[in-house]
Amino acid sequence: MGMEVVGTEAAPAEVKVTDGEVNLFQENESKATAKEREEAVLFGSDNSTATANGAANGADLAPPKDAEEDWPEARKTHSFFFVKIRLLEDPKLKMKIDQAEKDFQKKIQARSQIFEAIKAKKNERFGIISELKPLAAENKQYNEAVSEKLKAIEPLRNRLGKFRDENNAIRAQGAGICSSIEELEKSIKRLNDRISHESIPLDEEKRLIKQIRELEKTRPKVISTSANRAQIQDTVVERDAIQDQVKIIGEGIDGVKKERQAVRSKIKVLEDELKAIDMEMGSLQEDLTAANARKDKAHESLVQLRHARDAYNASFHQNRQLLSKARDLASRSELAQVQELYKTQVDKFVAEWCNSKAFREDYEKRILSSLNSRQLSRDGRMRNPDEKPIFIETEAAAPPVEQEPIQSKMPAKQAKEAPAPQAEVSPKDESRVKAIAKPSKAKSSLDADDDYEAESPKEKPKPKEVDVAKLKEIKRQEEMEKNRLALERKKKLAEKQAAKAAARAQKEAEKKLKREEMRARRRAGAADTEASTESDNRSDGAAEAQAEDDSAPASAPVMREQRESVRYSRNVVTKSKAPLPKAILRRKKAQSYWSWAGPAAAVAAALVALLAVLGYYQYYLPASASN
């Protein structure tokens, strides 16, 4: 099995050369180089300065002081090889994380859509409130104006009430007595005349005398009542003026109330709209709360899955931190610490490699991709030309199951136009299909509500969540379509009823016209002789025969029309439009006018004579007896 290592170079220490030290450059120098150096030193020198034995001075043969800069020593590099642990992603866990991220993004988008809807409703609500404020101020002004006018009219009404109470008191006081002295005198005089000029019994005369005495007793009351009435009559002008003022103020109040009512109607409409918007905002707020809860739950699932991924790659993260620390120590030339860190890491890796089979399998999985990319075999050898690449076992992610779109309710018109299915389903099969569909719908709804959690390998993918706002819009469009179709049906029914009513009215008018014609014929025929009646009967018979001849060809299209109506409208009961048979009335023999006019005149004359006799005995005889 191959092992992947990472080399770390420690910065070498600088080599400093002093005068007392042995120059390594001079020790390693070859003789040829020394000879050349000696010749170079002796070249151009004065022979007089040489020693007697011809040897040069050792100090003159030493290298110059800047030799270290011209010929620097090769820098020594320390290399330490650490074991590298690569990142490995679990395909199942990666698929779950991707699905959880998609679900989380969908929840965020759904919440943002609800936010936008709430924002739009808030703007609409703000517009309605801005319209309500001036209307409320105007309504307040109208209320103040009405209250001021009511305050102004209150004392006038009190004054009129006082007049009314006084008038009622005077009327109650003068009830049963004469209204004035003149009327009292006339009543007394009439009774006296009756006593003196008429022949009446004694009891009647006593009764009349008693009435005269009672009238005389009421004279003081009549005088006081007439005086009070005179006083009230003096206040009539003032009362009329007050009534005029009350009328003018009342008209002003009525005008202000009409304007206020118009403003209040506008305010009521806006308040109803505001209440509807508040209700919609409340429902949207509930949807937002639910969306926030779903988003938080999806985020928790995603965080848990990410923690699981981090726990699965904990060895990779630890190795990454160790390598970063080693690079940091190497950059600071801390050789001992790098060496100690290297030894500790390698010893630990070897111990785990020898003791744990799971560690070996995990490390092998992690390094396979690196070996494959470097064209190496499993044991780290160079791959032979005929050797196949290393097969990395990875489970392919299952393709996402496409969720079937929600079938919205079709309008009635489209449902009628849609063709019927070819295969007919029996009632038993239909009930079985419905029974299977109910648990599947419940399961899909539970899966849609639950957020992404740790799934078993056999768990089915969850269907996509449907947007709430989109569903509401679809339902609203369906309701509008239903209302439109209902209105069309009502219009058609109203048109049919109107047509039937018009036909019925036309038939009634024709019947009435026929009745009038028959009555006119009866009246005209009553004065004719028997000869004329016979001629009329003949003419009626001829007219009837002609009508029957005319109705015979017309009956054919009528029957055809009835057949067509029966053929195309099965459920509609058609009425026959064939003309009804004409009724022939036999005329009675006319009676003579003088046969009943003479007796009637005699009876009337007898009644007039009887009434004249009764009037004479009732009126004229008593008057003559009294005179």
UniProtKB/Swiss-Prot annotation:
Low complexity bias spans: 45-60, 411-424, 434-445
Places the protein is found: Cell membrane
Region named Disordered: 28-70, 394-572
Coiled-coil regions listed: 253-300, 468-519
Composition bias type Basic and acidic residues, residue spans: 28-40, 455-498, 505-519
Cellular component GO terms held in the UniProt record: plasma membrane
Alphabetic keyword roster: Cell membrane, Coiled coil, Membrane, Transmembrane, Transmembrane helix
Induction, as annotated: Induced by brassinolide.
TM annotation in the entry: 596-616
Domain of life, per lineage: Eukaryota
Membrane topology annotation: Single-pass membrane protein
Homology family: Belongs to the plant proton pump-interactor protein family.
Record's subunit section: Interacts with BRI1.
Biological function: May regulate plasma membrane ATPase activity.
Protein name: Proton pump-interactor BIP103
Encoding gene, per UniProt annotation: BIP103
